[in-house]
A protein has these predicted regions:
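A bilobed periplasmic-binding-protein/Venus flytrap-type ligand-binding module shared by bacterial periplasmic
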Residues: 78-93
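A post-motif C-terminal structural segment
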Residues: 54, 74-80
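Ligand-binding "clamshell"
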Residues: 45-50, 59-73
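Ligand-binding clefts/hinges and TM-proximal coupling segments of bilobed small-molecule sensing domains
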Residues: 10-13, 94-141
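Short secondary-structure boundary segments
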Residues: 54-56, 86
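Bilobed "Venus flytrap"/periplasmic-binding protein-like clamshell domains
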Residues: 1-36, 40, 124-128
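Short coil/turn segments
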Residues: 4-11, 86-89, 105
Length: 144
């Protein structure tokens, strides 16, 4: 059984794409969430056998899930990018852009996975994790 977001049976990069690109067919589909906690829990419990997760999900690195290689580029790259309201950009201007650029330059997939693990697997407060990371990177006061 494959688990994924409710729109997966119609999305070209989900079930139809897996069938067309890799010849994969699943007996059933479970509508869950978009690679979030419901999907992860269903995989870990054995309720589903396959799903799409984000590469920054720490459960993949925990050793009990197998990450498959998408050597035919079915899945698009989904990079983390800052998005601002125009009013926010106008209010804070170049200083905010410079700060966001500095964070983006240091926030690799490996770093984001490690940060996610601290929150999702170790139960740490997201603000504290982000603040520590910012301080460790020499970026400002480390407050979030």
């Amino acid at each position: 059984m494959f688990g994924g977001p409710p729109e997966c049976p119609e999305r070209p990069d989900c079930l139809p794409g897996l069938r067309r690109t890799y010849g994969l067919r699943f007996r059933a589909f479970a509508a869950l969430d978009a690679g979030g906690p419901l999907t992860r829990q269903a995989l870990e419990a054995g309720d589903i056998g396959a799903a799409l997760l984000f590469t920054t999900d720490p459960a993949i690195r925990a050793g009990h899930l197998v990450e498959l290689t998408d050597n035919r580029d079915l899945q698009p790259a989904e990079n983390v990018i800052p998005v601002l309201r125009r009013a926010t950009a106008t209010r804070y201007g170049a200083g905010l852009f410079a700060a966001l650029d500095a964070v983006s330059a240091r926030l690799s997939t490996a770093a984001l996975t490690a940060l996610n693990a601290q929150v999702q697997m170790n139960g740490r407060d997201p603000h504290a994790v982000a603040g520590s990371w910012l301080r460790d990177q020499g970026l400002g006061r480390g407050t979030s």
